[in-house]
Amino acid sequence: MKKIFLPFALFSMAACASDSEDFNTSNDASIIGKWYIEKVEVFKSKNQQTQTMTSTECKKKSTHEFKSTNMTSITFAPQGNNCIQTDVVTRNYTFNTANKKFWYEGEQDYPYYITQLTQTDMVMEDRLEDFDNDGINDVITRFFKRID
């Protein structure tokens, strides 16, 4: 189960429980486009607490560009007093609009859930890791903002 979404793995130190019934979409909302992660929340099942991490200005330079069948993530990280590009990864994906599940090619058993999608905001949730080691996977929620 170590099929971790590489670009998010370094950033995912946080998540909040969210109900899939809260899915919100506008007429022209689409995951297609360029996004950055504004914040990440990790809801830990062991203590029922949410840890929130907001993106630094350097982390906001990291982008995730969704095209019709693949996504390219460009990662930036601080190095000394500079913000440098550290990685570029392109992966094929599938987005099922009926159930709002998103997964990478060959990883259907490790889905992400799009719980909100508007023209400017996207919320993606997963339950793939147990951060607090209590035997229950925790909920990681990533809040994306579209880049104009």
Residue ranges and their predicted role:
Residues A17-V88, N96-D148:
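Lipid interaction determinants
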Residues I4-M13:
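Sec-dependent N-terminal signal peptides
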